[in-house]
Amino acid sequence: MNNKTRKVLVPLIAIVFGFLLGAIIMLAFGYNPIWGYEDLFISALGSARSIGETLQTMGPLILTALSFAVAMKVGLFNIGMSGQALAGWISSMWFALSFPDIPRLLMIPLVVIIGMVFGAFMGFIPGILRALLGTSEVITTIMLNYIMLFFSTFMIHSMFQKNILMDNTTDQTKLISANASFRTNWMSSLTDNSTLNIGLIIAIIALVIMAIIFTKTTLGFEIKAVGLNPDASEYAGISAKRTLILSMVVAGALAGLGGVVYGFGYMQNFVSQSASLDIGFYGMAVALLGGNSPIGILFAALLFSVLQTGAPGMTNDGIPPEIVKVVTAAIIFFIAVKFIIEVMLPKAKAIKASEATKKKGEKA
């Protein structure tokens, strides 16, 4: 079995196993899995509005998945997308609410740039610590998630101007003005007043740009080279330290952009968070399922968006929507142990070939 076929089969097998495990759990608790999955897909794709909501969910997932993929290609495990996205969200939201009268054509690029800059800074910290001190990026990105989580709460409680906060609360801001929102009338009317917004277009543009960088540029080659062998890259004249830092900066910028898309496309304000943003961890799952490739990320983001958007529909048959989280976790699990699947597939093929040879020998 060639490598391309394996890259396609392994995620598909993981998805099938994930849905099978979800079905087994539903059966064990007396629910009908066929009805449950039917309600899930109808809820996610059964109307123009639900399709719009599913597509809207894809935007932040694509961007955080790209963030994880960039780091993985250089050999780093970026678990800091939640903190990086949160940094992008709160910084850009603060700007938009503080200067609400900026024209839309100027406001949209500015909030995008601000979110990416602050996300990039959150990626720069673990990048430089890893490059110069050898500090594990896993530990630093996890810690930075918590630092950003609590710092964002401090910011909204103590640093935000009172005139941009919602009345009688310090836990959320007022809604952004129409000139800052990523929602458009034509996208809303096209999908029966869903929250579909230009964030999806921004995410797809980022996807195309990263695909070009990975395959057509010197930077993409250097990232892959350092990821495969840092020492050999240094010998060939590629600075591994510079590439590590730059990769984490790019990863942070993409995650920060994901936070901007989430805030200005879906939320429309900033709300104090009690836990890390889901889009960070789901982005990791999307990247793993998509094999860290842009096209794989696109389809994986669609699947996870369907699962998230359709989950509430399962309650129509009394099935807890948390079952979808089991399916999601199972898919991630089977992707994580894909080497087992990759070993099993060649062995199964070898056994079949051996049996076929024996049968031919017996006939002869």
Swiss-Prot record:
MF-aspect GO terms: transmembrane transporter activity
InterPro entries listed in its UniProt record: ABC_transp_permease (IPR001851)
Membrane topology summary: Multi-pass membrane protein
GO CC list: plasma membrane
Entry similarity comment: Belongs to the binding-protein-dependent transport system permease family.
Quaternary structure, from the entry: The complex is composed of two ATP-binding proteins (NupA), two transmembrane proteins (NupB and NupC) and a solute-binding protein (BmpA).
Protein name: Nucleoside ABC transporter permease protein NupB
Gene: nupB
